[in-house]
């Protein structure tokens, strides 16, 4: 999902969707365009979601600016912004990935890298309670 997106039209601010996610949103256009490409940093103590991921990921071209909730675990960030944040809601796990999962901000280099498949498999297993 695009968080607030173009002109803030995502409409998640103040909704149950925002309530269950480990991040909050500004009530405005939250896109951060990075046409030069950026590389994310991950915490030194690797979370199981990051198993099989390289230390430096292929570049992305932008992200949605979000704010980690106090109880969120941010495992990937860029310039202080949470890119991959984890949380819980009732009996389940939640996750926010603040960039694209398809070609646009997710560069062709990233989409075609073997780590892309590894990341998404790990995320699905984590959310299903089968990892970590």
Feature-to-residue mapping (PLM):
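A glycine-centered loop/beta-turn motif at secondary-structure junctions
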Residues: 1-3, 7-12, 16-17, 65-132
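An acidic, glycine-rich "communication" segment
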Residues: 3-81
